[in-house]
């Protein structure tokens, strides 16, 4: 089933704009749904890299969005894939 990593492009500082990445790998077949959430609500505009595959023919993709970290907001990445019975959510 997909491996999910959620991390920032730059060291996070509250109040300083950053990029939040959701890297999803080790999945097959290639169809996958990736959502990024702020306080449990879907972030409407996220960027997606092209789907790529590894030497073992598993797929990987990177979703990312601009965001500004704060103490009060929580961010997560939710992935839906045929290999899992229900969506998997990983918090940042």
UniProtKB/Swiss-Prot annotation:
| Subcellular location per the Swiss-Prot or TrEMBL entry | Secreted
Please tell me the species this chain comes from.
Answer: Mus caroli
Record's function text:
Component of the class I major histocompatibility complex (MHC). Involved in the presentation of peptide antigens to the immune system.
Q: Indicate what this protein is called per its UniProt record.
A: Beta-2-microglobulin
Q: Is Aminoacyl-tRNA synthetase included in the keywords of this UniProt record?
A: no
- Which SUPFAM superfamilies does the protein's record reference? Immunoglobulin
Q: Upper taxonomic classification of the species?
A: Eukaryota, Metazoa, Chordata, Craniata, Vertebrata
Sorted UniProt keywords? Disulfide bond, Immunity, Immunoglobulin domain, MHC I, Secreted
What does the record list as GO biological process? antigen processing and presentation of peptide antigen via MHC class I; immune response
């Amino acid at each position: 089933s997909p491996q999910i990593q959620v991390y920032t492009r730059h060291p996070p500082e509250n109040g300083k704009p950053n990029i939040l990445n959701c890297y999803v790998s080790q999945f097959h077949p290639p169809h996958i749904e990736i959502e990024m959430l702020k306080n449990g609500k879907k972030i409407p505009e996220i960027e997606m890299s092209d789907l790529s595959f590894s030497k073992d023919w598993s797929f990987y993709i990177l979703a990312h969005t601009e965001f500004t970290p704060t103490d009060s907001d929580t961010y997560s990445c939710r992935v839906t894939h045929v290999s899992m019975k229900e969506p998997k959510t990983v918090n940042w």
